């Protein structure tokens, strides 16, 4: 079941996201901007008490992380119908699942966290340069 993140989920979220750079990017954004931010919303996919995926909506961008690649495509389809993202970023296998929903987007790959711009076009910086590198990032760009 997909639901919005609350402060009570903090330890579960930290434990789930701390292993890979994709998860750490989401965790750092949550820690930097909090859950009360008007430009950021975090959704959790919790099944039988176990966290299966995390979806961060930040300034018309979506970052996702699902360890076992169990991306909830129905949830993303609903989300995209409400808010068409500028970018969708995450681990390559996670983003590849989303690509069939966004057929007019261009796929890009890299070893670095993609740039995310705020509502006024300013670059959002929530990680150090060293933290931005690692993993095989995939980004769908409009």
Regions found by a protein language model. Give the residues of each.
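Conserved donor-binding loop and adjoining core beta-sheet/short helix segment
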Residues: 21, 28-86
């Amino acid at each position: 079941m997909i639901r919005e993140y609350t402060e009570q989920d903090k330890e579960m979220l930290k434990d789930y996201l701390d292993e890979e750079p994709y998860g750490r990017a989401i965790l750092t954004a949550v820690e930097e901007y909090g859950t009360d931010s008007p430009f950021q919303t975090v959704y959790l996919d919790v099944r039988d008490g176990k966290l299966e995926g995390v979806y961060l909506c930040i300034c018309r961008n979506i970052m996702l992380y699902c360890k076992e690649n169990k991306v909830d495509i129905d949830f993303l389809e609903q989300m995209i119908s409400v808010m068409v993202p500028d970018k969708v970023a995450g681990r390559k296998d996670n983003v590849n699942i989303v690509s069939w929903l966004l057929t007019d987007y261009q796929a890009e790959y890299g070893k670095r966290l993609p740039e995310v711009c705020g509502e006024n076009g300013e670059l959002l910086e929530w990680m150090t340069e060293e933290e931005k590198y690692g993993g095989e990032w995939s980004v769908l760009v409009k």
